[in-house]
């Protein structure tokens, strides 16, 4: 179970890693808005989770063989990382585990992103490795070492995230938030192109991305 800022997610996976059920539903954001307050996002998760969980457990073969429940509890696996939205999924996860008499395991939203890709790739057993996490609130390069327990930021953005740039530009174009998928479709259909952005400068593994938003805004004007 994962309850992030913009999406309610519930999945069922067997011991081999096969996905038996996968439900992802975006939270509702008003036209022209660039996101949700934590309180509104939490409320929507509480409303959407019961139906998603019911669908996940509707198959008797799945429901009668659940061995554990896992859920995200915070954005990153570092001390002090916290967002109220994750308490929605954590609360439901603990309740389900107690009702079924099975153990539960906590993880961070960022670890979920990384492991969801890593597990099904050729990097499954590679250690250590550097992962790149680009999302609506994160643009980071992370050094991951399972044996030493290292999960360290070694690069990324000093200001806003790539996802924020895409969403802000997309909303300016009149697209619904979040805008990434719609912008991808526009890019695929585009005929020709012209360069409107200056190259991004990197300093010791870090970049600043707010200038991209400014340049895109001027281009739209």
Segments predicted by a language model, with ranges:
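Conserved phosphate-binding catalytic cores of ATP/NTP-utilizing and phosphoryl-transfer enzymes
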Residues: 102-130
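Short beta-strand-loop/turn "lid" adjacent to the catalytic site in phosphate-handling enzymes
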Residues: 54-94
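A glycine- and small-aliphatic-rich helix-loop capping segment at beta-alpha/alpha-beta transitions
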Residues: 14-19, 84-95, 100-102, 120-125, ...
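Short, well-ordered amphipathic alpha-helical segments that serve as non-catalytic structural scaffolds
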Residues: 23-25, 44-60
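Acidic, glycine-rich active-site loops and adjacent beta-strand->loop/helix elements
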Residues: 7, 72-77, 108-114, 138
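Short glycine-rich, Thr/Ser-proximal phosphate-binding strand/loop in the N-terminal lobe
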Residues: 4-43, 150-153
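A short helix-loop
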Residues: 3, 11, 22, 125-126, ...
